[in-house]
Amino acid sequence: MTDIINLINDFGQSNPERVAVRHKDEELTYQQLMDESSKLAHLLQDNHKPLIVYGHMSPYMLVGMIGAIKAGCGYVPIDTSVPSERVNMIINKVQPDIIFNTSDTQLNHSNIQELTIQSIQDSDNPTLFDSQMGLTDVVYTIFTSGSTGEPKGVQIEYASLIEFAEWMVSLNESEGSQEWLNQAPFSFDLSVMAIYPCLTSGGTLNLVDKEMINKPKLLNEMLVNTPINAWVSTPSFMEMCLLLPNLNESSYPSLNHFFFCGEILPHRTAKALLDRYPSAVVYNTYGPTEATVAVTGIKLTPEVIEAYNPLPVGVSRPNTSLFTTDEGELVIKGNSVSLGYLDNKEKTDAVFNFEDGLRIYHTGDKAIEKDGQWFIQGRIDFQIKLNGYRMELEEIETQLRQSEFVRETVVVPVYKNNKVIHLIGAVVPTEEVRDDLEMTRQIKSELKSRLPEYMIPRKFVWMKQLPLTSNGKLDRKQVAEDINA
Protein backbone atom coordinates (compact mmCIF):
# COMPACT_ATOMS: atom_id res chain seq x y z
CA MET A 1 0.00 0.00 0.00
CA THR A 2 1.74 3.15 -1.26
CA ASP A 3 1.03 6.51 0.35
CA ILE A 4 -0.88 8.85 -1.97
CA ILE A 5 1.09 11.93 -0.95
CA ASN A 6 4.39 10.15 -1.57
CA LEU A 7 3.26 9.12 -5.07
CA ILE A 8 2.20 12.65 -5.98
CA ASN A 9 5.34 14.12 -4.45
CA ASP A 10 7.64 11.68 -6.28
CA PHE A 11 6.06 12.48 -9.61
CA GLY A 12 6.21 16.19 -8.86
CA GLN A 13 9.93 16.00 -8.16
CA SER A 14 10.65 14.31 -11.49
CA ASN A 15 8.07 16.30 -13.51
CA PRO A 16 7.67 19.61 -11.63
CA GLU A 17 6.35 21.60 -14.60
CA ARG A 18 3.66 19.16 -15.67
CA VAL A 19 0.18 20.56 -15.09
CA ALA A 20 -1.54 18.74 -12.22
CA VAL A 21 -4.97 20.40 -12.37
CA ARG A 22 -6.66 22.72 -14.86
CA HIS A 23 -9.91 24.68 -14.89
CA LYS A 24 -10.42 26.98 -17.86
CA ASP A 25 -7.44 29.37 -17.77
CA GLU A 26 -6.43 28.43 -14.22
CA GLU A 27 -3.89 25.69 -13.67
CA LEU A 28 -1.38 24.44 -11.15
CA THR A 29 1.74 22.43 -11.90
CA TYR A 30 2.76 19.50 -9.72
CA GLN A 31 5.44 21.71 -8.17
CA GLN A 32 2.89 24.40 -7.36
CA LEU A 33 0.39 21.87 -6.02
CA MET A 34 2.92 20.35 -3.64
CA ASP A 35 4.41 23.70 -2.59
CA GLU A 36 1.08 25.39 -1.93
CA SER A 37 -0.39 22.37 -0.14
CA SER A 38 2.69 22.19 2.11
CA LYS A 39 2.31 25.87 2.99
CA LEU A 40 -1.31 25.19 3.89
CA ALA A 41 -0.36 22.08 5.89
CA HIS A 42 1.92 24.20 8.08
CA LEU A 43 -1.08 26.38 8.90
CA LEU A 44 -3.13 23.29 9.73
CA GLN A 45 -0.59 21.20 11.63
CA ASP A 46 -2.01 22.02 15.07
CA ASN A 47 -5.58 21.60 13.81
CA HIS A 48 -7.26 18.35 14.83
CA LYS A 49 -10.62 19.04 13.21
CA PRO A 50 -11.43 18.49 9.52
CA LEU A 51 -10.74 21.34 7.11
CA ILE A 52 -13.78 22.64 5.26
CA VAL A 53 -12.78 23.15 1.60
CA TYR A 54 -15.32 25.46 -0.03
CA GLY A 55 -15.60 26.50 -3.68
CA HIS A 56 -16.43 25.32 -7.17
CA MET A 57 -13.88 23.59 -9.38
CA SER A 58 -11.01 25.84 -8.34
CA PRO A 59 -7.59 24.19 -8.73
CA TYR A 60 -6.90 25.51 -5.24
CA MET A 61 -9.55 23.17 -3.86
CA LEU A 62 -7.01 20.45 -4.64
CA VAL A 63 -4.46 22.44 -2.63
CA GLY A 64 -6.93 22.33 0.25
CA MET A 65 -7.49 18.59 -0.03
CA ILE A 66 -3.82 17.65 -0.35
CA GLY A 67 -2.85 20.12 2.37
CA ALA A 68 -5.42 18.64 4.76
CA ILE A 69 -4.16 15.12 4.05
CA LYS A 70 -0.58 16.21 4.72
CA ALA A 71 -1.61 17.87 7.98
CA GLY A 72 -3.47 14.72 9.03
CA CYS A 73 -6.77 16.48 9.73
CA GLY A 74 -8.69 15.39 6.61
CA TYR A 75 -11.15 17.53 4.69
CA VAL A 76 -14.83 18.15 4.02
CA PRO A 77 -15.58 19.45 0.49
CA ILE A 78 -18.54 21.79 -0.04
CA ASP A 79 -19.50 23.10 -3.47
CA THR A 80 -20.80 26.65 -3.94
CA SER A 81 -24.02 25.22 -5.43
CA VAL A 82 -25.00 23.92 -1.98
CA PRO A 83 -27.68 26.23 -0.45
CA SER A 84 -26.50 28.39 2.44
CA GLU A 85 -28.77 26.70 4.98
CA ARG A 86 -27.32 23.31 4.09
CA VAL A 87 -23.78 24.73 4.21
CA ASN A 88 -24.50 25.97 7.72
CA MET A 89 -25.84 22.54 8.72
CA ILE A 90 -22.62 20.91 7.55
CA ILE A 91 -20.40 23.48 9.25
CA ASN A 92 -22.34 23.10 12.51
CA LYS A 93 -21.97 19.32 12.30
CA VAL A 94 -18.22 19.42 11.53
CA GLN A 95 -17.39 22.23 13.98
CA PRO A 96 -14.19 23.15 12.09
CA ASP A 97 -11.52 25.50 13.35
CA ILE A 98 -10.59 26.54 9.80
CA ILE A 99 -12.40 26.97 6.47
CA PHE A 100 -10.39 27.17 3.25
CA ASN A 101 -12.58 29.32 1.02
CA THR A 102 -11.60 29.32 -2.66
CA SER A 103 -14.68 31.28 -3.77
CA ASP A 104 -15.27 35.03 -3.98
CA THR A 105 -17.99 34.92 -1.31
CA GLN A 106 -17.16 35.15 2.38
CA LEU A 107 -18.91 32.63 4.63
CA ASN A 108 -18.53 34.80 7.75
CA HIS A 109 -18.75 32.27 10.57
CA SER A 110 -17.72 33.66 13.92
CA ASN A 111 -14.98 31.80 15.78
CA ILE A 112 -13.92 30.00 12.58
CA GLN A 113 -10.76 31.13 10.80
CA GLU A 114 -11.32 31.61 7.08
CA LEU A 115 -8.31 31.12 4.82
CA THR A 116 -8.33 32.27 1.19
CA ILE A 117 -6.27 31.52 -1.89
CA GLN A 118 -4.50 34.83 -1.37
CA SER A 119 -3.57 33.96 2.20
CA ILE A 120 -1.86 30.77 1.00
CA GLN A 121 -0.10 32.50 -1.88
CA ASP A 122 1.16 35.23 0.46
CA SER A 123 2.31 32.81 3.14
CA ASP A 124 6.05 32.47 3.70
CA ASN A 125 5.65 29.01 5.25
CA PRO A 126 8.09 26.32 4.06
CA THR A 127 7.17 24.41 0.90
CA LEU A 128 8.09 21.04 2.41
CA PHE A 129 5.91 19.09 4.82
CA ASP A 130 6.04 15.42 5.84
CA SER A 131 2.56 13.91 5.66
CA GLN A 132 0.96 13.20 9.03
CA MET A 133 -2.04 11.22 7.72
CA GLY A 134 -2.24 7.73 9.23
CA LEU A 135 -3.82 4.77 7.45
CA THR A 136 -6.69 4.59 9.95
CA ASP A 137 -7.30 8.36 10.03
CA VAL A 138 -10.35 9.93 8.39
CA VAL A 139 -9.10 11.36 5.09
CA TYR A 140 -12.37 12.94 3.94
CA THR A 141 -15.99 13.34 4.98
CA ILE A 142 -18.61 13.75 2.26
CA PHE A 143 -22.15 14.69 3.18
CA THR A 144 -25.07 12.86 1.61
CA SER A 145 -28.82 13.17 1.95
CA GLY A 146 -30.39 12.38 5.33
CA SER A 147 -34.00 11.38 6.11
CA THR A 148 -34.26 13.75 9.10
CA GLY A 149 -33.65 16.79 6.93
CA GLU A 150 -30.02 16.93 7.99
CA PRO A 151 -27.24 15.63 5.70
CA LYS A 152 -25.12 12.68 6.87
CA GLY A 153 -21.32 12.94 6.91
CA VAL A 154 -19.75 9.77 5.49
CA GLN A 155 -16.26 9.27 6.95
CA ILE A 156 -13.68 7.48 4.80
CA GLU A 157 -10.35 6.34 6.21
CA TYR A 158 -7.05 6.88 4.42
CA ALA A 159 -6.36 3.17 3.81
CA SER A 160 -9.72 2.83 2.03
CA LEU A 161 -8.90 5.73 -0.27
CA ILE A 162 -5.45 4.34 -1.07
CA GLU A 163 -6.90 0.93 -1.96
CA PHE A 164 -9.53 2.53 -4.16
CA ALA A 165 -6.99 4.67 -6.03
CA GLU A 166 -4.74 1.64 -6.58
CA TRP A 167 -7.68 -0.37 -7.96
CA MET A 168 -8.66 2.42 -10.34
CA VAL A 169 -5.08 2.74 -11.62
CA SER A 170 -5.04 -1.04 -12.22
CA LEU A 171 -8.05 -0.70 -14.55
CA ASN A 172 -6.22 1.81 -16.71
CA GLU A 173 -4.69 0.11 -19.74
CA SER A 174 -2.66 3.10 -20.94
CA GLU A 175 0.95 3.77 -20.07
CA GLY A 176 2.32 7.15 -19.12
CA SER A 177 0.59 10.30 -17.92
CA GLN A 178 -2.95 11.04 -19.07
CA GLU A 179 -5.34 13.96 -19.31
CA TRP A 180 -8.33 13.14 -17.08
CA LEU A 181 -11.78 14.72 -17.23
CA ASN A 182 -13.72 15.15 -13.98
CA GLN A 183 -17.40 16.06 -14.29
CA ALA A 184 -18.46 15.87 -10.64
CA PRO A 185 -18.26 18.71 -8.09
CA PHE A 186 -15.92 17.86 -5.23
CA SER A 187 -18.80 17.50 -2.75
CA PHE A 188 -19.95 14.49 -4.83
CA ASP A 189 -17.76 11.43 -4.22
CA LEU A 190 -17.66 10.57 -7.93
CA SER A 191 -14.94 13.24 -8.12
CA VAL A 192 -12.71 10.98 -5.99
CA MET A 193 -12.75 8.51 -8.90
CA ALA A 194 -10.93 11.09 -11.01
CA ILE A 195 -8.79 13.02 -8.51
CA TYR A 196 -6.58 10.39 -6.92
CA PRO A 197 -6.13 7.88 -9.75
CA CYS A 198 -5.16 10.85 -11.93
CA LEU A 199 -2.70 12.51 -9.54
CA THR A 200 -1.08 9.28 -8.30
CA SER A 201 -0.33 8.28 -11.90
CA GLY A 202 1.06 11.67 -12.91
CA GLY A 203 -1.93 12.80 -14.94
CA THR A 204 -3.58 16.18 -15.43
CA LEU A 205 -7.03 16.69 -13.90
CA ASN A 206 -9.34 18.76 -16.13
CA LEU A 207 -12.37 20.14 -14.31
CA VAL A 208 -15.81 20.49 -15.90
CA ASP A 209 -17.70 23.34 -14.27
CA LYS A 210 -21.45 23.72 -13.84
CA GLU A 211 -21.79 25.85 -16.99
CA MET A 212 -20.69 22.87 -19.08
CA ILE A 213 -23.04 20.41 -17.39
CA ASN A 214 -26.08 21.63 -19.32
CA LYS A 215 -24.25 22.97 -22.37
CA PRO A 216 -22.43 20.24 -24.28
CA LYS A 217 -21.13 22.79 -26.79
CA LEU A 218 -18.95 24.32 -24.06
CA LEU A 219 -17.55 20.88 -23.33
CA ASN A 220 -16.92 20.48 -27.03
CA GLU A 221 -14.63 23.52 -26.91
CA MET A 222 -12.74 21.96 -24.02
CA LEU A 223 -12.25 18.71 -25.92
CA VAL A 224 -10.98 20.63 -28.95
CA ASN A 225 -8.35 22.41 -26.86
CA THR A 226 -7.36 19.54 -24.56
CA PRO A 227 -6.63 15.96 -25.69
CA ILE A 228 -8.60 14.21 -22.93
CA ASN A 229 -7.67 10.54 -22.44
CA ALA A 230 -9.69 9.37 -19.42
CA TRP A 231 -13.30 10.38 -18.83
CA VAL A 232 -15.05 10.10 -15.43
CA SER A 233 -18.75 11.02 -15.20
CA THR A 234 -22.26 9.89 -14.44
CA PRO A 235 -24.10 8.03 -17.21
CA SER A 236 -26.57 10.93 -17.45
CA PHE A 237 -23.80 13.36 -18.33
CA MET A 238 -22.57 11.00 -21.04
CA GLU A 239 -26.11 10.67 -22.42
CA MET A 240 -26.23 14.43 -22.83
CA CYS A 241 -22.77 14.57 -24.38
CA LEU A 242 -23.71 11.92 -26.93
CA LEU A 243 -25.95 14.61 -28.43
CA LEU A 244 -22.70 16.03 -29.81
CA PRO A 245 -22.41 14.38 -33.23
CA ASN A 246 -18.62 14.74 -33.25
CA LEU A 247 -18.05 12.93 -29.96
CA ASN A 248 -16.43 9.97 -31.65
CA GLU A 249 -13.11 8.25 -32.21
CA SER A 250 -12.29 10.08 -35.44
CA SER A 251 -12.91 13.56 -33.99
CA TYR A 252 -11.34 12.96 -30.56
CA PRO A 253 -9.03 9.97 -30.93
CA SER A 254 -7.22 10.69 -27.65
CA LEU A 255 -10.26 9.60 -25.62
CA ASN A 256 -9.60 5.96 -24.79
CA HIS A 257 -10.88 5.36 -21.25
CA PHE A 258 -14.37 5.92 -19.83
CA PHE A 259 -15.37 5.29 -16.21
CA PHE A 260 -19.01 5.52 -15.12
CA CYS A 261 -20.46 5.52 -11.62
CA GLY A 262 -23.14 7.24 -9.55
CA GLU A 263 -26.23 5.71 -11.18
CA ILE A 264 -27.35 2.89 -13.44
CA LEU A 265 -25.69 2.95 -16.86
CA PRO A 266 -28.44 2.47 -19.48
CA HIS A 267 -27.77 -0.22 -22.05
CA ARG A 268 -28.52 2.15 -24.93
CA THR A 269 -25.96 4.68 -23.63
CA ALA A 270 -23.20 2.10 -23.35
CA LYS A 271 -23.97 0.69 -26.79
CA ALA A 272 -24.00 4.15 -28.39
CA LEU A 273 -20.66 4.99 -26.78
CA LEU A 274 -19.00 1.75 -27.89
CA ASP A 275 -20.35 2.25 -31.40
CA ARG A 276 -18.52 5.59 -31.48
CA TYR A 277 -15.44 4.41 -29.56
CA PRO A 278 -14.98 0.74 -30.48
CA SER A 279 -11.35 0.74 -29.29
CA ALA A 280 -11.98 2.41 -25.93
CA VAL A 281 -11.78 0.89 -22.46
CA VAL A 282 -15.24 1.43 -20.91
CA TYR A 283 -15.94 0.53 -17.27
CA ASN A 284 -19.30 0.33 -15.57
CA THR A 285 -18.83 0.57 -11.79
CA TYR A 286 -21.05 0.59 -8.73
CA GLY A 287 -20.75 1.70 -5.15
CA PRO A 288 -22.26 3.91 -2.45
CA THR A 289 -20.44 6.82 -0.82
CA GLU A 290 -20.30 4.64 2.31
CA ALA A 291 -17.98 2.18 0.56
CA THR A 292 -15.40 4.55 -0.95
CA VAL A 293 -16.96 5.43 -4.31
CA ALA A 294 -17.09 2.06 -6.09
CA VAL A 295 -16.80 -1.58 -5.06
CA THR A 296 -17.50 -3.36 -8.35
CA GLY A 297 -16.51 -2.91 -11.95
CA ILE A 298 -16.80 -4.53 -15.34
CA LYS A 299 -15.11 -3.74 -18.62
CA LEU A 300 -17.86 -3.35 -21.21
CA THR A 301 -17.20 -5.04 -24.54
CA PRO A 302 -19.47 -5.67 -27.53
CA GLU A 303 -19.91 -9.20 -26.16
CA VAL A 304 -21.11 -7.90 -22.77
CA ILE A 305 -23.44 -5.43 -24.48
CA GLU A 306 -24.86 -8.24 -26.60
CA ALA A 307 -25.27 -10.64 -23.68
CA TYR A 308 -26.85 -8.42 -21.03
CA ASN A 309 -29.65 -5.87 -20.86
CA PRO A 310 -29.71 -4.41 -18.23
CA LEU A 311 -25.96 -4.29 -17.80
CA PRO A 312 -24.07 -5.87 -14.91
CA VAL A 313 -21.95 -3.76 -12.57
CA GLY A 314 -19.28 -6.44 -12.46
CA VAL A 315 -17.34 -8.17 -9.73
CA SER A 316 -16.13 -6.88 -6.38
CA ARG A 317 -12.71 -5.29 -6.12
CA PRO A 318 -9.90 -6.71 -3.94
CA ASN A 319 -10.42 -6.88 -0.16
CA THR A 320 -14.16 -6.34 -0.59
CA SER A 321 -16.91 -8.95 -0.64
CA LEU A 322 -20.62 -8.69 -1.43
CA PHE A 323 -23.63 -10.71 -0.37
CA THR A 324 -27.39 -10.26 -0.14
CA THR A 325 -29.84 -10.65 2.71
CA ASP A 326 -32.98 -12.78 2.48
CA GLU A 327 -34.82 -9.63 1.36
CA GLY A 328 -32.36 -9.14 -1.51
CA GLU A 329 -30.52 -6.19 0.03
CA LEU A 330 -26.89 -5.87 -1.02
CA VAL A 331 -24.37 -5.87 1.83
CA ILE A 332 -20.75 -4.77 1.43
CA LYS A 333 -17.99 -6.18 3.63
CA GLY A 334 -14.34 -5.20 3.75
CA ASN A 335 -11.75 -2.46 3.78
CA SER A 336 -13.74 -0.17 1.49
CA VAL A 337 -16.53 0.35 4.03
CA SER A 338 -16.80 3.73 5.76
CA LEU A 339 -16.07 4.33 9.44
CA GLY A 340 -19.66 5.53 9.77
CA TYR A 341 -21.49 8.84 9.89
CA LEU A 342 -19.94 11.83 11.61
CA ASP A 343 -21.47 12.42 15.04
CA ASN A 344 -24.50 10.26 14.24
CA LYS A 345 -24.37 7.02 16.22
CA GLU A 346 -28.02 6.16 15.65
CA LYS A 347 -27.74 6.25 11.86
CA THR A 348 -24.35 4.53 11.96
CA ASP A 349 -25.58 1.65 14.12
CA ALA A 350 -28.60 1.20 11.82
CA VAL A 351 -26.58 0.33 8.70
CA PHE A 352 -23.00 -0.44 9.81
CA ASN A 353 -21.69 -3.36 11.86
CA PHE A 354 -18.76 -5.79 12.08
CA GLU A 355 -18.23 -9.39 11.04
CA ASP A 356 -14.94 -11.29 11.41
CA GLY A 357 -13.25 -8.02 12.33
CA LEU A 358 -14.32 -6.36 9.07
CA ARG A 359 -16.75 -3.49 8.59
CA ILE A 360 -20.11 -4.19 6.98
CA TYR A 361 -22.52 -1.77 5.31
CA HIS A 362 -26.15 -2.45 4.41
CA THR A 363 -26.65 -0.52 1.16
CA GLY A 364 -30.42 -0.43 0.82
CA ASP A 365 -29.93 -1.52 -2.81
CA LYS A 366 -31.57 -4.57 -4.32
CA ALA A 367 -29.10 -6.81 -6.12
CA ILE A 368 -28.66 -10.26 -7.61
CA GLU A 369 -25.62 -12.23 -8.72
CA LYS A 370 -25.79 -13.96 -12.08
CA ASP A 371 -23.03 -15.53 -14.19
CA GLY A 372 -20.54 -14.34 -11.59
CA GLN A 373 -21.59 -10.72 -12.11
CA TRP A 374 -23.58 -8.39 -9.87
CA PHE A 375 -26.72 -6.62 -11.09
CA ILE A 376 -28.34 -3.69 -9.26
CA GLN A 377 -32.14 -3.73 -9.29
CA GLY A 378 -33.02 -0.48 -7.55
CA ARG A 379 -33.64 0.68 -3.98
CA ILE A 380 -35.43 -1.18 -1.20
CA ASP A 381 -36.32 2.06 0.55
CA PHE A 382 -37.24 5.57 -0.53
CA GLN A 383 -33.73 6.63 -1.44
CA ILE A 384 -33.22 7.31 -5.12
CA LYS A 385 -30.68 8.57 -7.61
CA LEU A 386 -31.47 11.45 -9.94
CA ASN A 387 -28.85 12.62 -12.46
CA GLY A 388 -26.20 10.78 -10.46
CA TYR A 389 -27.08 12.39 -7.13
CA ARG A 390 -28.22 10.16 -4.32
CA MET A 391 -31.00 11.56 -2.19
CA GLU A 392 -33.61 10.48 0.31
CA LEU A 393 -37.16 11.47 -0.53
CA GLU A 394 -37.88 11.90 3.18
CA GLU A 395 -35.34 14.73 3.38
CA ILE A 396 -37.16 16.62 0.62
CA GLU A 397 -40.46 15.97 2.36
CA THR A 398 -39.05 17.24 5.67
CA GLN A 399 -38.05 20.50 4.02
CA LEU A 400 -41.37 20.79 2.17
CA ARG A 401 -43.27 20.44 5.43
CA GLN A 402 -41.53 23.56 6.73
CA SER A 403 -43.44 25.64 4.18
CA GLU A 404 -46.41 27.60 5.46
CA PHE A 405 -48.34 26.40 2.41
CA VAL A 406 -47.79 22.66 3.02
CA ARG A 407 -49.78 20.60 5.51
CA GLU A 408 -48.58 17.19 4.37
CA THR A 409 -46.60 15.89 1.43
CA VAL A 410 -45.14 12.91 -0.37
CA VAL A 411 -42.44 13.20 -3.01
CA VAL A 412 -42.85 10.76 -5.89
CA PRO A 413 -40.09 9.84 -8.33
CA VAL A 414 -41.11 9.59 -11.99
CA TYR A 415 -39.42 6.74 -13.86
CA LYS A 416 -38.63 6.18 -17.50
CA ASN A 417 -36.80 3.04 -18.62
CA ASN A 418 -36.18 2.10 -14.95
CA LYS A 419 -34.46 5.42 -14.29
CA VAL A 420 -35.67 8.41 -12.26
CA ILE A 421 -36.09 11.41 -14.60
CA HIS A 422 -37.71 13.93 -12.23
CA LEU A 423 -39.70 14.36 -9.02
CA ILE A 424 -43.32 15.32 -8.32
CA GLY A 425 -44.44 16.69 -4.98
CA ALA A 426 -47.90 15.56 -3.87
CA VAL A 427 -49.03 18.25 -1.43
CA VAL A 428 -51.96 18.67 0.92
CA PRO A 429 -52.02 22.49 1.05
CA THR A 430 -52.83 24.53 4.14
CA GLU A 431 -55.29 26.59 2.12
CA GLU A 432 -57.21 26.33 -1.13
CA VAL A 433 -54.97 26.70 -4.16
CA ARG A 434 -56.42 29.44 -6.34
CA ASP A 435 -53.38 29.99 -8.56
CA ASP A 436 -51.44 26.82 -9.35
CA LEU A 437 -48.45 28.56 -10.93
CA GLU A 438 -48.09 31.11 -8.14
CA MET A 439 -48.31 28.49 -5.39
CA THR A 440 -45.71 26.37 -7.18
CA ARG A 441 -43.43 29.38 -7.53
CA GLN A 442 -43.69 30.25 -3.84
CA ILE A 443 -42.96 26.72 -2.65
CA LYS A 444 -40.01 26.33 -5.02
CA SER A 445 -38.65 29.68 -3.89
CA GLU A 446 -38.67 28.48 -0.27
CA LEU A 447 -37.02 25.18 -1.17
CA LYS A 448 -34.18 26.87 -3.06
CA SER A 449 -32.83 28.26 0.20
CA ARG A 450 -32.77 24.83 1.81
CA LEU A 451 -32.11 22.24 -0.89
CA PRO A 452 -29.87 21.85 -3.94
CA GLU A 453 -31.62 22.49 -7.25
CA TYR A 454 -31.58 18.82 -8.23
CA MET A 455 -33.63 17.89 -5.12
CA ILE A 456 -36.50 20.28 -5.86
CA PRO A 457 -39.58 18.61 -7.44
CA ARG A 458 -40.27 19.68 -11.00
CA LYS A 459 -43.99 20.06 -10.38
CA PHE A 460 -46.60 19.80 -7.63
CA VAL A 461 -50.04 18.25 -7.51
CA TRP A 462 -52.60 19.25 -4.90
CA MET A 463 -54.49 16.62 -2.89
CA LYS A 464 -57.22 16.86 -0.26
CA GLN A 465 -55.62 14.11 1.80
CA LEU A 466 -52.95 11.44 1.52
CA PRO A 467 -54.04 7.77 1.51
CA LEU A 468 -53.05 5.43 4.32
CA THR A 469 -52.44 1.68 4.39
CA SER A 470 -54.53 -0.67 6.48
CA ASN A 471 -52.08 -0.40 9.38
CA GLY A 472 -52.27 3.39 9.35
CA LYS A 473 -49.05 4.13 7.52
CA LEU A 474 -48.73 6.50 4.59
CA ASP A 475 -49.48 4.63 1.36
CA ARG A 476 -46.76 5.92 -0.95
CA LYS A 477 -47.59 3.38 -3.61
CA GLN A 478 -51.17 4.62 -3.79
CA VAL A 479 -50.01 8.24 -4.02
CA ALA A 480 -47.80 7.33 -6.96
CA GLU A 481 -50.69 5.49 -8.64
CA ASP A 482 -53.02 8.46 -8.10
CA ILE A 483 -50.49 10.85 -9.63
CA ASN A 484 -49.90 8.63 -12.64
CA ALA A 485 -53.58 7.79 -13.17
Swiss-Prot record:
The keyword Ligase applies. It is an enzyme of class 6 (ligase). It comes from the Bacteria. It is found in: Cytoplasm. Signal peptide: none annotated. Keywords: ATP-binding, Cytoplasm, Ligase, Nucleotide-binding. One of its GO terms (biological process) is lipoteichoic acid biosynthetic process. D-alanine binds at residues 189, 293, 473. Disulfide bonds: none annotated. ATP binds at residues 144-145, 284-289, 365, 473. Pathway: Cell wall biogenesis; lipoteichoic acid biosynthesis. Its main location: cytoplasm. GO terms for cellular component: cytoplasm. Pfam families: AMP-binding (PF00501), AMP-binding_C (PF13193). It catalyses: holo-[D-alanyl-carrier protein] + D-alanine + ATP = D-alanyl-[D-alanyl-carrier protein] + AMP + diphosphate. One of its GO terms (molecular function) is D-alanine [D-alanyl carrier protein] ligase activity. Its EC number is 6.2.1.54. Gene3D superfamilies: 3.30.300.30, N-terminal domain of ligase-like (3.40.50.12780). NCBIfam families: AA-adenyl-dom (TIGR01733), D-ala-DACP-lig (TIGR01734), PRK04813.1 (NF003417). HAMAP family: DltA. Belongs to the ATP-dependent AMP-binding enzyme family. DltA subfamily. Catalyzes the first step in the D-alanylation of lipoteichoic acid (LTA), the activation of D-alanine and its transfer onto the D-alanyl carrier protein (Dcp) DltC. In an ATP-dependent two-step reaction, forms a high energy D-alanyl-AMP intermediate, followed by transfer of the D-alanyl residue as a thiol ester to the phosphopantheinyl prosthetic group of the Dcp. D-alanylation of LTA plays an important role in modulating the properties of the cell wall in Gram-positive bacteria, influencing the net charge of the cell wall. This is D-alanine--D-alanyl carrier protein ligase. It comes from Staphylococcus haemolyticus (strain JCSC1435).
